[in-house]
C-alpha cells in the first residue's frame, strides 16, 4: 500500500474531467504553469486515463474540502517531494491526512503552533490510490525541502504512522505519568515517617483508653439481664489465656473475705516479681474509669484470704494461682479499704450477729438422722452458757425429733444455726426429743424455767407452742385448739372426738374423716405427737382430764 502511494506521488494520474470541483479547479489552475497534467482526480464518475496504471473508479472523500488548515496534521509528515511538486495551493484549500485511516479521531489535538507557522507556505495535494480502499488521501508537504529519494519518502510516511500511534496513546501516557507522580508524592522521608508513627501510636493508645472507659460506663448503665447478655457474647470471643485470667480474678473476688496489706506486699508474699505487678497495674490503671474501687478491694483482700487458707491447711489456691502465673495487682492505687459486706464469707465464727439470717427467711429442707452432738461448743462458761443453751434448745422443741444429745455439747453460736435447721423440719416429734430437755436440767435450771423460756422463745412459731397445745382449757375445747393451729375449718370434722382420742389418730384416719390437704394432716400429726409426749411424761395438768367425753 505504501509502495503504491509512493508510485502515485511520482506518477500522478491525469484526469480530463474537472466537473466543477473547486479544489480540483484550484489545483488545475496552479498546475498549468508548470505541468501539462492535472494531479487531482475528479469527484465525479470519470475514469482515469493513465497509460501505466489501470486503477478502478476512484472518488474523492466527501469531507476533504471541509477540513480547515487549523485541524490538519501538518507535522505528521515533515518533508516534500522536491521538484516534482512545484505547483502551490492556497492554504484555505489545503487538506490533511484523514485520521480515520490512521486510527485517530478527527478531534485529536495536534501541534497547532506548527500548523499556524506553516499555514502560509505553498501546499500541494497528491492523490493516493490503492487496491484495498476507495478513499482519497491528501498529503501536505512543505516546499522548502528538496530531497526526492524514495527512502526518505517511505520513512516520512512511516513516521507519520508512528506519530499517529503516539498521539492515540497520549491519554494513557498522561494517566501513567500522573499515577507515577502521585506515587512519588505519597512517599515521605524517614524522619516524617517516624514522627507520624509516634503520633499514630499515641493516638491509638488514647483512643483505646477512651473506648475502654466508654465501655465500662456503658456497662454500668445496663440492667443485670442486659449485662448477662453482653458477657455471654464477650466470653464467646475471648482467648483462652484471657478466660483463664478472668476465672482467676473471679475466684479471687468471691473467695476473698476481708482487707489485707497493700497490693505490693501481697505480690511479695505470692512470690511474684514486684516489677511485673507494677507494669500490670500501670496498664490497667489507665484503662480503669474509676480507679481504687473494686480492683483495690480485691487486691487488698487477697492477702487475708491466703492467710486464712494457710491456717486451715489448704494450699489449693496457691497451686492454682502459681499455675496461672498471673498477677493479682490490678490497680496501682490500692488502699486499705474495709469491706464488711464480705466478712461473712471468711468464717461463721467471726461474722457479726447482724449477719445471721432471720427466722422468717429460712431454707426449708428435711434433715434425717441429724445429731446435735456433731457441733462442738466454743463458749461454755457456767450458768450463763447453760441459760443460753436452754433458751436455744427450747426454741427448737417444736420440730426436730431426731436430735439426741446433751446440752453441754452445744455452743451458743452453733445452736442458733441448729435452730434454723430444726425449725424448718417437717418431721413429727417423738418422745426422744423430750429427753433432750430433761437432760439439760442441772443445779441452775428447773422445769419451770424451761417452760418459761420455751414460751418466750417460741413466739416465732406460736401455732406449735407445746404450752398452748397442752393447755387444759384448749384441750377440752377442740375448735379453739384447732384454731391455734389455724386449722379451724376442720372443727366440724374433728369436734366429736375428745383430745385423748384425737391425738392417736393416724394419717389414714384423718384422710378418711375428710382432711384432704397434705399440709394440714402433717401439721395435725405434729401437734398430736407433742401432746402425746407431754401426756406420757405427765406434764399435762390434771384439769384437762376432768371434762373428757
Swiss-Prot record:
Biased composition (Polar residues): 16-57, 113-127
Location within or outside the cell: Cytoplasm, Cytosol; Cytoplasm, P-body
SMART domains: SAM
Pfam entry (one): SAM_2
Biased composition (Low complexity): 128-140, 189-206, 379-415, 435-469
Origin superkingdom: Eukaryota
Region (Disordered): 1-57, 113-155, 181-206, 256-293, 371-422, 435-470
GO biological process, one term: nuclear-transcribed mRNA poly(A) tail shortening
Segments of skewed composition (Basic and acidic residues): 1-13
Residue span(s) of domain SAM: 473-534
GO CC terms: cytosol; P-body
Xref: InterPro entries: SAM (IPR001660), SAM/pointed_sf (IPR013761), SMAUG/VTS1_RNA-bind (IPR050897), VTS1_SAM (IPR037635)
GO MF, one example: nucleotide binding
Keywords of this entry: Cytoplasm, Nucleotide-binding, Protein transport, RNA-binding, Transport
Similarity remark: Belongs to the VTS1 family.
Subunit structure: Monomer. Binds to RNA.
Reported function: RNA-binding protein involved in post-transcriptional regulation through transcript degradation.
Designated name of the protein: RNA-binding protein VTS1
Organism of origin: Candida glabrata (strain ATCC 2001 / BCRC 20586 / JCM 3761 / NBRC 0622 / NRRL Y-65 / CBS 138)
Amino acid at each position: 500500500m505504501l509502495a503504491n502511494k509512493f508510485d502515485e506521488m511520482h506518477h500522478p494520474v491525469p484526469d480530463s474531467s474537472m466537473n466543477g470541483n473547486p479544489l480540483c479547479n484550484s489545483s488545475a489552475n496552479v498546475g498549468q504553469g508548470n505541468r501539462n497534467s492535472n494531479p487531482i482526480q475528479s469527484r465525479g464518475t470519470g475514469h482515469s486515463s493513465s497509460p501505466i496504471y489501470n486503477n478502478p473508479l476512484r472518488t474523492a472523500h466527501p469531507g476533504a474540502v471541509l477540513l480547515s488548515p487549523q485541524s490538519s496534521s501538518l507535522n505528521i509528515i515533515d518533508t516534500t517531494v522536491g521538484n516534482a511538486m512545484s505547483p502551490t495551493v492556497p492554504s484555505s484549500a489545503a487538506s490533511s491526512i484523514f485520521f480515520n485511516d490512521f486510527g485517530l479521531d478527527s478531534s485529536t489535538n495536534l501541534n497547532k503552533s506548527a500548523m499556524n507557522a506553516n499555514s502560509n507556505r505553498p501546499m500541494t495535494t497528491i492523490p493516493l490510490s490503492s487496491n484495498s480502499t476507495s478513499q482519497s488521501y491528501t498529503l501536505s508537504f512543505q516546499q522548502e525541502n528538496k530531497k526526492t529519494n524514495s527512502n526518505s519518502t517511505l520513512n516520512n510516511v512511516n513516521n507519520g504512522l508512528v506519530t499517529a500511534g503516539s498521539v492515540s496513546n497520549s491519554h494513557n501516557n498522561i494517566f501513567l505519568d500522573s499515577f507515577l507522580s502521585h506515587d512519588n508524592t505519597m512517599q515521605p522521608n524517614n524522619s516524617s515517617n517516624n514522627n507520624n508513627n509516634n503520633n499514630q501510636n499515641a493516638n491509638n493508645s488514647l483512643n483505646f483508653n477512651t473506648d475502654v472507659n466508654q465501655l465500662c460506663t456503658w456497662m454500668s448503665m445496663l440492667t443485670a439481664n442486659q449485662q448477662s447478655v453482653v458477657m455471654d457474647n464477650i466470653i464467646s470471643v475471648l482467648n483462652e489465656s484471657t478466660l483463664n485470667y478472668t476465672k482467676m480474678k473471679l475466684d479471687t473476688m468471691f473467695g476473698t473475705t476481708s482487707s489485707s496489706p497493700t497490693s505490693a506486699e501481697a505480690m511479695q508474699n505470692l512470690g511474684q516479681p514486684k516489677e511485673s505487678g507494677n507494669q500490670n497495674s500501670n496498664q490497667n490503671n489507665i484503662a480503669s474509669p474509676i480507679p481504687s474501687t473494686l480492683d483495690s478491694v480485691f487486691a487488698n483482700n487477697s492477702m487475708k484470704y491466703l492467710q486464712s487458707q494457710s491456717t486451715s491447711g489448704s494450699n489449693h489456691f496457691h497451686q492454682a494461682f502459681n499455675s496461672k502465673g498471673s498477677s493479682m495487682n490490678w490497680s496501682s492505687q490500692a488502699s486499705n479499704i474495709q469491706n464488711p459486706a464480705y466478712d461473712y464469707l471468711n468464717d461463721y465464727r467471726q461474722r457479726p450477729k447482724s449477719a445471721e439470717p432471720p427466722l422468717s427467711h429460712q431454707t426449708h429442707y428435711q434433715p434425717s438422722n441429724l445429731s446435735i452432738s456433731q457441733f462442738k461448743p466454743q463458749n461454755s462458761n457456767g450458768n450463763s452458757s447453760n441459760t443460753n443453751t436452754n433458751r436455744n434448745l427450747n426454741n427448737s422443741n417444736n420440730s426436730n425429733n431426731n436430735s439426741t444429745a446433751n446440752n453441754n455439747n452445744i455452743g451458743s453460736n452453733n445452736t442458733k444455726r441448729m435452730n434454723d435447721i430444726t425449725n424448718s423440719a417437717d418431721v413429727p416429734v417423738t418422745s426422744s426429743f423430750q429427753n433432750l430437755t430433761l437432760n439439760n436440767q442441772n443445779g441452775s435450771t428447773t422445769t419451770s424455767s424451761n417452760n418459761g423460756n420455751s414460751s418466750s422463745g417460741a413466739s416465732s412459731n406460736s401455732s406449735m407452742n407445746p404450752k398452748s397445745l397442752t393447755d387444759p382449757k384448749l384441750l377440752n375445747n377442740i375448735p379453739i385448739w384447732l384454731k391455734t393451729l389455724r386449722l379451724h375449718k376442720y372443727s366440724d370434722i374433728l369436734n366429736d372426738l375428745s383430745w385423748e382420742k384425737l391425738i392417736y389418730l393416724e394419717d389414714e384416719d384423718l384422710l378418711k374423716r375428710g382432711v384432704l390437704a397434705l399440709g394440714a394432716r402433717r401439721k395435725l400429726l405434729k401437734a398430736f405427737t407433742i401432746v402425746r409426749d407431754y401426756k406420757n411424761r405427765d406434764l399435762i395438768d390434771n384439769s384437762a382430764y376432768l371434762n373428757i367425753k
